[in-house]
Amino acid sequence: MKMLWNNFKVAFAMYSKIPMPMADWNKENMKYTFCFFPFIGLVIGALSYLVGWAGGKFGFNPSFVSAVLVLVPVMVTGGIHVDGLLDTSDALSSWQERERRLEILKDSHAGAFAVITACAFFLIWYGAYSQLWTDRRALLIMALGFMVSRCCPE
C-alpha cells in the first residue's frame, strides 16, 4: 500500500502543479506511476466541470468562462503537454535533417511555428468551450476526456 501511495505522489508531483508530500523517487518505487495518470485527468476534468457549472450558476460572461476553461488544464499541469506540442511543432515544421530536428526539440526557445501552433491550439479549445460550456452533458464529456486520454500510457 505504501508503494502505491508513493506512486500516486510521484505521478502528481511530476505531471501536475498540485503540491504533494515528499515522495521516494527511485526506479523501483516508480513502477506503477502511470496507473495514476487518469487521476490527474480526473482532477483536471472535475475542475473544468466545476468552472463551467459555476460560470453558468453565477451568470459569468461566456467569453470569460471559456477562457478560464482553456486555462484550467494549463494551470493544473504547468503546461507540460502544451510545451511538448510546441516543441514538436517547431521541430517538425523546420524541414531540417533528423539531427537538427532533435536539437530543435531540446531548444528551450519558442520558434515561429510554436507560436502559430499555440495560437491555433488555444483558439480551437476556446471555440469548443464557447459553444459547449452551457450544455452540461457536453461539458461532462469534455471533462471526462482528460481522464480517458490518460488511461492509455502509450
Regions found by a protein language model. Name each.
Residues 1-78, 92-100, 107, 113-154:
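Hydrophobic alpha-helical transmembrane segments
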